Amino acid sequence: MNPNHPHISRVDGGFPDDFLDSLGHGTAVMAAIQEKAPDAEYFAVRVFDRELRTNIDALIAAIQWSIDRQMDIVNLSLGTSKHAEKFEPLVSRVIVVSAAGMFPGDLPGVIRVAPDPDIARDRYRVEGETFFASGYPRSMPGVSRERNLSGVSFAVANMTGFVARACENLTDRSYQSVFEKLRSE
């Protein structure tokens, strides 16, 4: 994550100490979240290095790092088709926002998100247990929407911003309370 990017208002900490994003993915994800919930605290936890690939141990360590520091929300703008059993003991201890159709997004107690190309970036909708949000990040001057990054990563990021905003006025920040608040808005 690049803390000097003009779309990033601040970063309150991170892991590892050098959490600089060489790909731009984490920066675009955080910018989308911060746009919707500018007053939340933000910590960058890097799981990608020089490519959009990681391993299950890095993901589990990142979630555990967040839990150990009593974070309220973990954005996982990624997913895997395996390892549900490794995510299960963690997702009940923090609000996780992740991609539908993958793990941990398809586990009970996770805010699962799918992209909707027709929804505005300042809106979301819910069908059953799945939230739908725009798959586009914040606009970049001089870059058309079609040439910018897009996809489920940014739908998850946009929804994470809505989750963070919903948590601002909740004393009970359990999955169920947050889910119900999001459904009612």
Give, region by region, the residue ranges found by the protein language model:
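Active-site core segment of subtilase-fold serine proteases
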Residues: 1-36, 40, 117-124, 140-143
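Active-site catalytic pocket residues across diverse enzymes, especially alpha/beta-hydrolases
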Residues: 36-37, 166-170
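Mature extracellular/periplasmic domains of secretome proteins
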Residues: 54-75, 84-95, 101-114, 119-132
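Extracellular S/T/G-rich loop segment that most often corresponds to the catalytic His/Ser-adjacent loop
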Residues: 100-168
